[in-house]
């Protein structure tokens, strides 16, 4: 008999999976809105930040193709990782790791290249720390669930 059939799915997997999917869906929406050049979306997202939607879109849309690809891997990898976690697939670990790699590339690019003045500050730093914390947690959590035989 398959050893994974005996492993009961812990209740927290569903909580983590659903919350991570919701969180990462927000990131996916942000990515789509940026790629589509949605000015109205940026008007709501920039409240309290000293930049126009046009300035913000111009900054994000000026990324080189490889950077945009890394951003896509980070965002869509996180969405796929969340779905794979809910499906109890061991591949969630690999996909979350790839997502974290995409996040690392985008973070390093922004640090090396520099960000516009409006994108620097406490709010941006907090958002970056939260994104890194959640992405790291999801990778560790998925790894833990795989080692316990929950992910097959």
For every predicted segment, state its role:
Residues 1-152:
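Topology signature of small-to-medium multi-pass alpha-helical membrane proteins
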């Amino acid at each position: 008999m398959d050893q994974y059939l005996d492993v009961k799915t812990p209740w927290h997997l569903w909580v983590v999976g659903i919350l991570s999917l919701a969180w990462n869906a927000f990131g996916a929406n942000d990515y789509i809105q940026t790629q589509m050049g949605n000015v109205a979306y940026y008007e709501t997202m920039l409240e309290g930040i000293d930049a126009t939607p046009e300035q913000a879109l111009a900054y994000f849309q000026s990324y080189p193709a490889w950077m945009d690809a890394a951003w896509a891997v980070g965002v869509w990898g996180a969405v796929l990782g969340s779905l794979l976690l809910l499906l109890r697939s061991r591949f969630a670990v690999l996909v979350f790791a790839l997502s974290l790699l995409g996040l690392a590339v985008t973070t390093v690019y922004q640090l090396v290249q520099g960000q516009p003045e409006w994108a620097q500050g406490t709010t941006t730093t907090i958002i970056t720390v939260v994104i890194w914390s959640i992405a790291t947690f999801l990778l560790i959590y998925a790894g833990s669930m795989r080692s316990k035989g929950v992910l097959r």
